[in-house]
Amino acid sequence: MNYLVMISFALLLMKGVESVRDAYIAKPENCVYHCAGNEGCNKLCTDNGAESGYCQWGGRYGNACWCIKLPDDVPIRVPGKCHR
């Protein structure tokens, strides 16, 4: 039984764990990508590894791209100022 656990753990480490989240995709200076429609956001999000994306109308940061299942290595909008 211990061998099965160890083999499972080793396979998990070899494969790696990919974490995703739903969030506003951000530019390097912590600014959101503003939008007018869903097509541009969906392309931006999927090009960055997300499952999909859409334009969040009237959200916290105005009309901005929201991504579904965005990988952890892609920057997201975090609290604080946009440094343009």
Curated annotation (Swiss-Prot):
Pfam families: Toxin_3. Expressed by the venom gland. It comes from the Eukaryota. Residues 1-19 form the signal peptide. The keyword Signal applies. CDD domains: neurotoxins_LC_scorpion (cd23106). This is Toxin BmKaTx13. Residues 84 form a propeptide. GO terms for biological process: defense response. It is found in: Secreted. GO terms for cellular component: extracellular region. The keyword Acetylation does not apply. GO terms for molecular function: sodium channel inhibitor activity; toxin activity. Disulfide bonds join 31-82, 35-55, 41-65, 45-67. Belongs to the long (4 C-C) scorpion toxin superfamily. Sodium channel inhibitor family. Alpha subfamily. SUPFAM superfamilies: Scorpion toxin-like (SSF57095). InterPro entries: LCN-type_CS_alpha_beta_dom, Scorpion_toxin-like, Scorpion_toxin-like_sf, Scorpion_toxinL, Scorpion_toxinL/defensin. Alpha toxins bind voltage-independently at site-3 of sodium channels (Nav) and inhibit the inactivation of the activated channels, thereby blocking neuronal transmission. This toxin is active against mammals.
